[in-house]
Amino acid sequence: MIENEEFKNLNDHWRNTIEKLSIYKDISEQTLERCDESFIETKKKICQDFDTIINYLTDRKIELLQQLGEELEAHKQQIESNRDKSMMLIEQLNKKMNSPSKFDININSSGGGGSGGVVFSGGGGGGLSHSTSYSGNLSNYLSASSGFASSPLNYSTSSLMVTNNNNNNPMTSPLKKSTSFQTDYLQVLKESISYIEWDWKDEFQENNTTNRKIIKQPKPISSMASDLILNSSFKSFDDLNKKFQEFSNNNDDTDDYDNNNNNNNDNKDDFDNCENNNNGDSLKMKSNKKLKIFGKLKFKIIETLEYKRLNSNLEDTKCIYSIGGKCKDGFDQYSIEKFDFKQGLWRSLQSIPSIMDNDFTGNFDGKNHIYLFGGSLQPTRILKYNLLEDQWEIIETNNNNNNNNNGANGANGNIEIPDNGRFLHCSVFDGKQNIYLIGGFPRSTSILKFNIITEQFSKQQSKSTTSSRNLWSMGAIYKEDNNSIYLIGGCNITRQSVDTLERYDIDNDSFTTLSPLPVSCYGAGVFYDDQEHYIYVLGGYNSKENKCLSIIQRYDLLDNSWSVLTNNHDDDDDDDGDSGGGLQNLLLPKPMMINGNSIIFDSSKRIVHILGGYNNVTKESIDDIYTLDISNILDENLSNKINWEVNKIPQFKNSKFKGGTSILVQK
């Protein structure tokens, strides 16, 4: 009996041991499978990450090479176009010189050289040959011994006059497309000849990332794991634990095992995060991987030494282009006028071919084109004006990210400016290839970047700390040395003027809040004096006092501080346009809203021009043009009285005020 009992106990012990060994075997097999799966999963992640990065770098390489090619092609096209114009002019002038009975050509130069013909130091009279004009005439012309080099070559119509038998002077009539080359024969000479040089940085950008979509491939599963997961009762480690728990309830000596495996639930995610299809043969995970953008490609335009020497013998040209604006009779004006500082008169040019109202912005690309963006009547419209040809064209883009369909379509059904367009916004040109559109209606929350080479839009990702992108009628200044945009004042959704000043860092795509304005305003005129590192804010509207301002606020970029300039001279005119200081702060001719589009700063002369304005309180329209030399503004308490000159630049040919845009072009 005792032997049977001992045998039974022995059998129970063996049975217990066998069950434990079976569990041990199962755990070993499962652990081996886990090791394999961990290896396979890690290997897959490594391969996926490298494949993702390699694919991204491949796409990035294609993107950068495409950018490189587009920039080169656009630059070459401009040079080739100007070269072709020069060839055409050479042919025209040769024909005119060979037809003295029909045309009289007079070149007047203070440096001498005869009359009745075109004289170059490298050759005698007669026509210019294209085949020798560069290799022969140019080399001689640029040589130090050239007698002609000492005398400026006057490109304007005062030095090169084409007179037919009817003695019609093109200077007395408005410039038209058909006569543009008759009146400015040598204007093409002021188009710079420059080469393009790229700056390539082969590093990942710290503050600029992109999201890449990762679709993980089916996870390789061994026959053991497949049988365990799909065909057996063990659907997960929880099932294995459950079986062991049932056994351990009757066996006290299994506590150590149970306590050492409390983390098995962590592996449940390996299965819960998977998508198992009906066939049970595919497991996929989907996710995005954030990668730092690799590489940064910038370019700069460098004027050739040969052209610099040629240009040194040409007179500088300086013109103001006034586009649009509202007339006193209440109608919108779609004309464009050009004021030539040398000639001292306004000339009518080709009218705007599209209704844009007055709430658009305009930017000069530094070469030969002016771009107009938006407007309340056509908020998605983009126009491009060719200065040399006096021609307009409507830009139609093919952006894939334009998902709105609000009727603002181009001729081919393309929406030009994304997000329903812009008006009452601000825009700045970075001096290279991008124009940035910020703020405005319809309550725009994104910064748009327009590439003038590809003529495509993209959106910046950064968000403003003070929601300046929701404002309208802001002032905007671009500062080249730190590649930043300064956003000044503006009007919010409740029509209240704000006092915010923000700096948008383009390279880092980030905003920084700076010291606020002393007096909040919107619709002010702003400009940047790069010599003294000041930002000036002129006039504008203050909603708190419900009045237009006639003060000048100045921001010092070096110490992040503002000052309101005060005039310590008595004035006969009593005006309540200041911030509470009485007559001492009346520094503008009148309280007015100027807007960034109606103020021009000539940095070379340090002269500011205000071209018209509007007082939205008194409803007074201002069509005078005011000029001020800011070199007299030395400190906050002005030692010299500010004297604005009225209509030193004569009034417009078509009297205008409020809105539109005015652009200074210097070459």
Swiss-Prot record:
Alphabetical UniProt keywords: Coiled coil, Kelch repeat, Repeat
InterPro entries: Beta-prop_ATRN-MKLN-like, Gal_Oxase/kelch_b-propeller, Kelch-typ_b-propeller, Kelch_1, Kelch_domain_containing_8
Cited Pfam families: Beta-prop_ATRN-LZTR1
Gene3D superfamilies hit by this protein: Kelch-type beta propeller
Coiled coil: 58-98
Statement: the UniProt record of this protein carries the keyword Cytoplasm: no
Keyword Methyltransferase set for record: no
Kelch repeats: from-to residues: 319-366, 369-412, 434-480, 484-531, 534-582, 607-654
Region annotation (Disordered) ranges: 248-281
Descriptive protein name: Kelch repeat-containing protein DDB_G0274267
